[in-house]
Amino acid sequence: CGSPAIQPQVTGYARIVNGEEAVPHSWPWQVSLQQSNGFHFCGGSLINENWVVTAAHCNVRTYHRVIVGEHDKASDENIQILKPSMVFTHPKWDSRTINNDISLIKLASPAVLGTNVSPVCLGESSDVFAPGMKCVTSGWGLTRYNAPGTPNKLQQAALPLMSNEECSQTWGNNMISDVMICAGAAGATSCMGDSGGPLVCQKDNVWTLVGIVSWGSSRCSVTTPAVYARVTELRGWVDQILAAN
């Protein structure tokens, strides 16, 4: 996991605002969640051929579509259109506090893995991803908060991780909990439509899912940290669901 066949290239790394177009298929775990009419409403990440992780607030239903292998939404590239058979939402998901903003989608048929489609590694409960570490988020979310529509091509942005203490200075102490991790405030951000998608960090040369795009500034301010569900804290629940299903 976590090793793209096509290498990503991220500027300044050696809902996405002030990002850049990704190298096509260089984030092979990136999923587009779409309504049956093809409208993209959230992102997600492939964690193995049968499972996708996304945000609980995306409200995925079994009639939605899971698209893997996509780069340009406007082209009929070699995508796989998959169906969810079951959706599991964290039992402690709270839409008021936005705590535990994670859902797992079991696919009705497995994704076919290959050059353009492969899973991301999941952060272990014991992993430490330090503040200041440069990580990358990707998605088809708005490139500015008042844009008329989402971009066709997958966007990416490098963002530094931030400590929860520092993040609380922006959002207030009661908003940022231990099941959240913040990143950004450095000139780029996630925006509407990126929700559920990945925040990945490179650890031991593999890309590891550290955050799930959860919430942030309503105007997608690039000087305000965006908030992600903290995968290391939620890993135990993920393992439980995968083991039982």
UniProtKB/Swiss-Prot annotation:
Residue ranges of domain Peptidase S1 in the record: 16-243
UniProt KW keywords: Digestion, Disulfide bond, Hydrolase, Protease, Secreted, Serine protease, Zymogen
Propeptide, residue positions: 14-15
Record: active site: 57, 101, 195
Record-listed E.C. numbers: 3.4.21.1
Catalytic activity: Preferential cleavage: Tyr-|-Xaa, Trp-|-Xaa, Phe-|-Xaa, Leu-|-Xaa
Name of the top EC class for this enzyme: hydrolase
Matching InterPro entries: Peptidase_S1_PA (IPR009003), Peptidase_S1_PA_chymotrypsin (IPR043504), Peptidase_S1A (IPR001314), Trypsin_dom (IPR001254), TRYPSIN_HIS (IPR018114), TRYPSIN_SER (IPR033116)
One of the GO biological process terms: digestion
Organism superkingdom: Eukaryota
Gene Ontology, cellular component aspect: extracellular region
CDD domains: Tryp_SPc (cd00190)
Disulfide pattern: 1-121, 42-58, 135-201, 167-182, 191-220
Cellular compartment(s): Secreted, Extracellular space
MF term (GO), any: serine-type endopeptidase activity
Stated family: Belongs to the peptidase S1 family.
PANTHER family in the cross-refs: CHYMOTRYPSIN-RELATED, CHYMOTRYPSINOGEN B2 PRECURSOR
Name the UniProt record assigns to this protein: Chymotrypsin B
Species annotation: Gadus morhua (Atlantic cod)
